[in-house]
Amino acid sequence: MTTLTKFALGMMGQLRPKPAQGDSATSLILPPPDKHGGLPLMEALAKRRSSREFARDTLPLSLLSGLLWAAYGENRSEGGRTAPSALNAQEIDVFVALPSGAYRYDAADHELRLVAANDLRRVTGYQDFVDEAPLDLVYVADHSRMNRVPVGQRTSYASVAAGAIAQNVYLFSAGNGLATVIRAWIDRNAIANALGLTHDQEVLLSQTVGYPK
C-alpha cells in the first residue's frame, strides 16, 4: 500500500490491520538474550544510522530476544531497565507488530504477550516500507504509572524515555547487522484502536526493524 493511500485512509479513519499470517500464539517465550554479542559500543555508534529499506526476512527468536532486551529489558535483579525513566516510573510499554499478531513485551518474564491477533504492521505508520518489514515496534506511555509527574509534563517525560529506548534499538541494530528507523509520522488513533489501548495510554513513536535490503 502506498504512502498516499495510507494517508488518505488515515484521514478517513479507515487505516485497518490485515489478517494475521499463521497462528497467533497467546505468548512467545523468548530465549535468554546474548549479553556478550554485537560490536563494541564505539563501533556501534560509528555505524548508527536510519534506514528505510528492509528485507522481508523474519528475525530469528534469538535475535528478537536480544533486540527487546537491549531496548527495554531488565538488567538488574531489582527490576531496573536498560533505558532510564523519570522517577523510575517505567511508563513505556513496547509493543511488537509481527505478521502473526501484535504483542506487548513483558520485561519481567522476558516474553511477548498477545494483544491483537492481526497483522498491525501497516497501521504503525504512513510509510510504505512498514507493511513488509518483519517487525515494527510501537512505544506507548501509560500515564497511570506517572502519578508523581505533573500532568502537563507527562508526555514530555515519556517521550524522553521512549527516545532512550529507540536509541538502544539503534545501537543494537548497528551492532548486529540490522536496519532501523524511528518514526513520528503515524496515525496514533489508528494504532491505539488496533492495540485496544485505554484512555490512560498514549502512542508516542514507532520504530521499524529488519535486515537491510
Spell out what each predicted region is:
Residues 196-213:
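A glycine-rich helix N-cap at a beta->alpha junction
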